[in-house]
Amino acid sequence: MASSIVSSAAVATRSNVAQASMVAPFTGLKSAASFPVTKKNNNVDITSLASNGGRVRCMQVWPPINMKKYETLSYLPDLSDEQLLKEVEYLLKNGWVPCLEFETEHGFVYRENHKSPGYYDGRYWTMWKLPMFGCTDATQVLAEVQEAKKAYPQAWIRIIGFDNVRQVQCISFIAYKPEGY
């Protein structure tokens, strides 16, 4: 019993020393009068405000007539074989699995089942063979694109980079469009 009394007294003296250097507890919010208030000034000079009005004339809207947007990089001209090779090398460098898909009727998102965009409208294409698991050479992917072009010359063909760890599609771009698109 005597040992417990001594130890509790030792603890009490330590806590008194620590409390002297502690910060005061939170006592609640102060009145709103101390917060800055924005006041409406009727004499504001509009010319001094920041503006991007000069740049607005430079902005353009994507023309929707005969210029459909497809996938990533669709705003650029068609990619050459050399540019496709670089894109596929980037895909492989990131450890993504290349996969080819093709669409014979619509190479863009369209609305078929309802007036509002649906989950299945134009987003799923037919897979060309199987995903190219273990592929390390970009020329193999381009050889498959050429083979798909021979089999379906009137189809859109896209290359997808699939991350099999996160199970997500990381990149998708059009590798071939039929004549006239």
UniProtKB/Swiss-Prot annotation:
Keyword Chloroplast applies: yes
Compartments where found: Plastid, Chloroplast
Record keywords: Calvin cycle, Carbon dioxide fixation, Chloroplast, Photorespiration, Photosynthesis, Plastid, Transit peptide
Keyword Transit peptide found: yes
GO biological process: photorespiration; reductive pentose-phosphate cycle
InterPro entries: RuBisCO_ssu (IPR024681), RuBisCO_ssu_dom (IPR000894), RuBisCO_ssu_N (IPR024680), RuBisCO_ssu_sf (IPR036385)
GO MF terms, alphabetically ordered: ribulose-bisphosphate carboxylase activity
Subunit structure as annotated in this protein's UniProt entry: Heterohexadecamer of 8 large and 8 small subunits.
Function: RuBisCO catalyzes two reactions: the carboxylation of D-ribulose 1,5-bisphosphate, the primary event in carbon dioxide fixation, as well as the oxidative fragmentation of the pentose substrate. Both reactions occur simultaneously and in competition at the same active site. Although the small subunit is not catalytic it is essential for maximal activity.
Additional record remark: The basic functional RuBisCO is composed of a large chain homodimer in a 'head-to-tail' conformation. In form I RuBisCO this homodimer is arranged in a barrel-like tetramer with the small subunits forming a tetrameric 'cap' on each end of the 'barrel'.
Protein name: Ribulose bisphosphate carboxylase small subunit, chloroplastic 6
Organism in which the protein naturally occurs: Solanum tuberosum (Potato)
